[in-house]
């Protein structure tokens, strides 16, 4: 548990993986951003929602985990 009884937030790459697995398919950056923010899976350090740019940057840093194909992010299997 996090502070004041709130569950601990996922890291952004964990939140992306969670969304991809739960949806059972690849998703676009805007779709991932929407799901992560709707479910409050990850928040920025300032408490604001995640941006498309952050999701894109996370994909780019984790290309060993994710693959970009036709505008869609997939898990590497």
Task: Name what the model sees in each region.
Residues 13-20:
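Hydrophobic residues on short alpha-helical segments
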Residues 2-13, 30, 37-77:
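Charged low-complexity interaction tracts in eukaryotic proteins
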Residues 21-25:
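Short helix-capping/hinge SLiMs at alpha-helix to coil transitions
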